[in-house]
């Protein structure tokens, strides 16, 4: 059998060089990192000897109100004196909230703490007590919760729209400097296969967006293999594995056995949401998918994927 002049070539992948950069973004609008437990809940109701958390609604709304005061001038004032006490013992539940000394255009807005290590924790705590009163939060040791509605938000003189997921709408709000309030659940309750409700809910803020571009550059080593004329025809059918001489010299004019070649650059873009989860900044640096139904997790078993609702267009 005669040898096929020129042989055939194949490429060995050595490695892929990857570089990702952010090419456009809305930086997280909410800079505070508040939470539900100590020191934020100091003095809150006690459930069987355990201090109740302030509640995710209280944290999300308080951070949102703190931001909106600077962004749209609403709300203007704060109650400088806020008091909460109460207890839960079995079926016995008592709650007492007192708000007084309302100060219009309060200077405390500019003195709010950034995180749990900052000063003036009491200012943020008082605002969470205010939210607890207006949203009728029910306090328990396992979690303090309340329903969110546009009418409750309107108690602060702020109007907004409630809707389901729409990428363009949410992004346009962020680009206008307006965060989005989110509510969702991680458990779907079913009876005989029929959904009867949802549980394990959470309220948080969607406040940032990123567009990232990834460049990939592959490096390969060329190998030349001698073949016979009888092999030539079937090798033409296996072009995904082998290059014929006329092909290899088109791609790599100076090809030689053992040459290291670069395939050139390929680019792909990805977009992500950024969240403020109300857990003292934990999980806030995680990037979340923007497609409908994307996993929004704070841990492997805490995916808030059910009944997502969005409050936006604050004015």
PLM features per residue range, with description:
Residues 49, 54-58, 145-146, 175, ...:
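Active-site-proximal structural scaffolding
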Residues 1-21, 223-262, 266, 271-315:
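Noncatalytic regulatory segments and standalone regulatory/sensor domains
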Residues 1-142:
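Active-site-adjacent structural segments surrounding the nucleophilic cysteine of cysteine proteases
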Residues 62, 67, 71, 188, ...:
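Short loop/turn segments at secondary-structure transitions that flank enzyme active sites
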Residues 153-154, 172, 180-183, 301-309, ...:
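Extended interaction regions within the primary functional domain
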Residues 159-269:
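Active-site-adjacent substructure of cysteine-protease-like catalytic cores
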